[in-house]
Design a protein with these regions (language model features):
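Glycine-aromatic micro-motifs
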Residues: 1-147
Length: 147
């Protein structure tokens, strides 16, 4: 299954635990979506990122091939939040070459608006660097850091 990862799931340490059989395919962005911190994490003690529809915006990430077992592990790792807090959804991403591709991603069922913390953003930025995402993506995430 081709799965679009973004935010903290791009961090290589986290990705290795949550989808151990993953294979990197390419970087891409999800058009007409933006990041919203709409779930609270007791582990991170801050808001967690999810994607929401947002015309004209984009969310950068990477597409990986993952197994059914990876998907089960990934879902189990979301145990920091109640069951059903996240859902899988089909989305069309655009590669750096402009190719459109239907993949799966996950999104939170929002419960409110929360703020991220610096340590969470730094964790995300490690993944952005690892997968060589765009400078636009890096700057977007740096802008989420608390002042």
């Amino acid at each position: 299954m081709k799965f679009f990862f973004y935010a903290d799931n791009l961090n290589p340490s986290q990705l290795k635990r949550r989808a151990p059989e993953h294979k990197f395919l390419f970087t891409a962005y999800l058009p007409d979506h933006s990041i919203q911190f709409c779930r609270w994490s007791t582990q991170w003690r801050c808001g967690l990122a999810s994607v929401i529809p947002s015309p004209g915006e984009k969310v950068w990430g990477a597409v990986f091939e993952i197994t059914d077992e990876d998907l089960k592990i990934l879902d189990d790792f979301e145990g920091d939040v109640p069951q059903g807090a996240y859902r899988h959804l089909p989305v069309t991403v655009i590669t750096e070459e402009g190719e459109k591709l239907l993949v799966t991603t996950h999104a939170a069922n929002p419960i409110g608006k929360f703020k991220p913390k610096e340590h969470y953003i730094d964790w995300v930025l490690k993944g952005i660097k690892q997968w060589k995402l765009s400078e636009e993506c890096t700057e977007q995430w740096k802008a989420y850091k608390p002042a």
